[in-house]
Amino acid sequence: MDGAWRVLDLSSFEGTLESDRGGISVHPESGEAVHVPVADLAIVLVGMGAKLSASVMHRLCTADVALLFCDWRGIPEGGAYSWSEHGRVAARHRAQAAMTLPRKKALHN
């Protein structure tokens, strides 16, 4: 995910997301569909009006793209991310698990 930089904000989006070759297709209720390569994505924010399938989640997680679910105000309230050993989140989990007890206590204060 070295080159991923793009945050796709669909928190107020109304429409459908579909898995597509090498990316996802964004289909607004009115307008043309847009193909977004997952290689460019770091984070995708989706709101209450977005419809997506497990295949979209699989495509994003496979590419180590974080998918955050937002409430009606656009504030993230949950998420899905890859459990890959090579991802950013997995690296952070390993680093936190390897901390000494005093450092773990300091982290939570």
PLM regions: where:
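N-terminal intrinsically disordered, cationic/polar leader segments
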Residues: 1-46, 50-109
